[in-house]
Amino acid sequence: DRFEYIYPNYLFAKEFNISKDKNKKVSFVSEGFQKHYQTNTYEAIVVNDIKYNTNQKIFNSGFVNDFEFLIRNVNSDSENSSNYKKDVNYEFLSSVLFKTSYPLIKKGNKNTKYFSPIFSAKYSPNQTKDISNEDRYISYENIFLMDRFGKNDFVEGGQSISLGLEFNNINNSDGRNIFNFGVAQIYRDNENLDLPEKTNLNQKTSDLVGNLNIFPTENFGIEYTFAVDNSLDHNNYNFVKANLKVN
């Protein structure tokens, strides 16, 4: 008989200020779980992260920079698992992320418009864990994040850069973002076949991902998310959502 037994998981997080500059912070996050499933499969995972983050720093030149450094300790114990190595294993991983943008602002009587070219660079000396068979993809919402695959038990190995553009139109009277458009793409020096094929993440050039959000009123809006193939000749993903608020 098959059964599944999931033990309680845990999450602990603590943030430290390491200097008088409140923009420079160190955080510690520890989380873990263990479970039995499919009769004889066992997984126990503990992940400890130490992260240094400068948050956003605005320079006189107009550039907005953000720097992040991650040290990750992954501890696993498993039997008959397709996700983790057999028995007890320990890994120490590291990754660094630098992001910069150059916001351009045009203020009007009714609206304020922001146009921002965005650049980020990631590097890790570690090899990527094989997640090529997992159903994961990149969106504009996560493409510039450290853990952009939504997993905390590995780091993305090698080096890559991400380039993007973002436009926002803000209503001055209520601060509402009435029009937002963002688009971005990942570039690598080498293929990374340990990453999923979806949205061409394992290729030198990923899909062009983006979103378009229109909120003409407080009660109605349309959100469009897309991924254009890296050959730019067809779409690999489209999703449209309408929001209607009734008072």
Residue ranges and their predicted role:
Residues 1-247:
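Outer-membrane beta-barrel proteins and related beta-barrel translocases across Gram-negative bacteria
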